[in-house]
Amino acid sequence: MIKKATLLTAFSVTAFSAWAQDTSPDTLVVTANRFQQPRSAVLAPVTIVTRQDIERWQSTSVNDVLRRLPGVDIAQSGGAGQNSSIFIRGTNSSHVLVLIDGVRLNLAGVSGSADLSQFPVSLVQRIEYIRGPRSAIYGSDAIGGVVNIITTRDNPGTELTAGWGSNSYQNYDISTQQQLGENTRATLIGDYEYTKGFDVVAKGGTGMQAQPDRDGFLSKTLYGALEHTFSDRWSGFVRGYGYDNRTDYDAYYSPGSPLIDTRKLYSQSWDAGLHFNGERIQSQLVSSYSHSKDYNYDPHYGRYDTSATLDEMKQYNVQWTNSVVVGHGNVGAGVDWQKQTTTPGTGYVPEGYDQRNTGVYLTGLQQLGDFTLEAAARSDDNSQFGRHGTWQTSAGWEFIEGYRFIASYGTSYKAPNLGQLYGYYGNPNLNPEKSKQWEGAFEGLTAGVSWRISGYRNDINDMIDYDDHLQKYYNEGKARIKGIEATANFDTGPLTHTVSYDYVDARNAITDTPLPRRSKQMAKYQLDWDVYDFDWGMTYQYLGSRYDSDYSAYPYRTVKMGGVSLWDLTVAYPVTSHLTVRGKIANLFDKDYETVYGYQTAGREYTLSGSYTF
């Protein structure tokens, strides 16, 4: 049972993502309602990934972390650094809100979608992943779910890591966290990653011209943070990070024209915050700035040639979030202000434009006996399309101790991005995409097995589609998504099991055809065990068949790509109390498959790494 005393205690401790840590036996979550609460009190399905999980899985990318989670389906045009899309519960990749330390990821500004193939996994200390609508709390984009990547580190000392692997993979990382006096803590991280990659274009009948090359990826990252405690009530932080990435890829081209097959991405982010932690009241003010420059070009001509394209975006954010303990729960309220600016000459937005958004939200959670009630409402005032309101409500009933029924309903929306509004084929009269979602779930603890079964429906209207004849974007699409999600985790002796199954029927509501690149069924299984100090891990994933389009001829045709079963194997061994060595075999049985038509994925890959702490 969710004890009232537990709730009251959790609501009165430090809140918000910059300070969120696993300090409670009942893990605390910030992202669900923008105030800290026990995970057991969150009515929406939530998954938490820690830095220890990432190291155990030996993940070399954020996509490799997310693909293991319930409801997540990733389509990628090749290997490391290649363009990728994240589908949560069948929604578009633009319907996933990605936050970095609670702040919207800047790279989604022009394209409208967050491509996490470019974000360094070395910076990720924790991920809080919420499924379902969250626009009533966060505003635009939070239709399918929210992924909050938290970079705040709480690991004093220094760690050196080096890794090597297939396709000339190399990774070198140094991170340190030191106390500067009694009340100040400093963190520094530097990371270098390189791989020659492989030829991502699939062989035979895809319509792509032969480009027999290796499509590699290079990333350099630097991160720094200062945290200071002024008193028992007040604390603050300053943080900055940047990365410089280069990706080689294969693209369509015309003989005699430049071949645009190289991407160069520069990204930097800075933020500062001040936090008040009272006995019953918490308040936080955060201001942030981010700037990204995304070039696509032919390396023979350079990124400043007239044939090159540039997407340049600046994003400014101010967030004021507050929460107060009320009764056996919490009430939260806050204001978000955001400004996105494009620079003249941006590839898809040739002139300079800016878009402002101010959002005001109110959330509440109460524990009334065996019932948990949750509600939220938000109003956004956007400089392009005016005001838009969203709301959601959920109720949980613990009808037997340890067993709970949950019902929820919520509205959400996706604002048109700057490319759709002001690009060469843009339409400044676009309206937001709108969603209505229902979900019912049972969850419980049976004989040591923690489980949850959910059924949901999502109706999305005014979807923004490109009209081939009019050569403009219009609000003319509709989608209907129905799904079932089941999750479970349990221990059997030294073995830890994590299981999930997803059935997703995502369809165009007008043509009744499947939405592209989504698997209809997914099954995922993670097994971890310790034997004589060896930490073993095995991952199994079944990805069902999916549909895509073959654009090699006009009119294009729909193609079906078959399902696949994938196995990964990992092992780690602590040679000493300071030195740990790790090894991994990904795609153990060397399966050949595609998640984007015409682009092959990696075959069997090996990695070996070691880390030394002091």
UniProtKB/Swiss-Prot annotation:
Instruction: Give the organism's phylogenetic lineage.
Output: Bacteria, Pseudomonadati, Pseudomonadota, Gammaproteobacteria, Enterobacterales
PANTHER family in UniProt:
COLICIN I RECEPTOR-RELATED (PTHR30069:SF53), TONB-DEPENDENT OUTER MEMBRANE RECEPTOR (PTHR30069)
Q: Which HAMAP family match?
A: BtuB (MF_01531)
> Which protein are we looking at?
Vitamin B12 transporter BtuB
**Ligand binding (Ca(2+) 2):** D213, D215, Y249, D250, D261
UniProt lists the gene as btuB
List UniProt keywords, sorted A-Z: Calcium, Cell outer membrane, Ion transport, Membrane, Metal-binding, Porin, Signal, TonB box, Transmembrane, Transmembrane beta strand, Transport
Q: Where is this motif: TonB box?
A: 26-33
The organism is Salmonella typhimurium (strain LT2 / SGSC1412 / ATCC 700720)
Give an example GO cellular component term for this record.
cell outer membrane
Q: What does this protein do?
A: Involved in the active translocation of vitamin B12 (cyanocobalamin) across the outer membrane to the periplasmic space. It derives its energy for transport by interacting with the trans-periplasmic membrane protein TonB.
Residue stretches spanning the membrane = 158-165, 169-178, 184-195, 217-227, 232-248, 263-277, 279-296, 309-325, 328-337, 353-369, 371-381, 385-400, 403-417, 434-443, 449-458, 473-490, 494-509, 517-529, 535-550, 558-572, 585-596, 602-614
Tell me which Gene Ontology terms the entry assigns under biological process: cobalamin transport; monoatomic ion transport
Binding sites annotated in the UniProt record for cyanocob(III)alamin: S85, N92, V110, S111, A251, T309, R517, Y551
User: Where does the record place the TBDR beta-barrel domain?
Assistant: 155-614
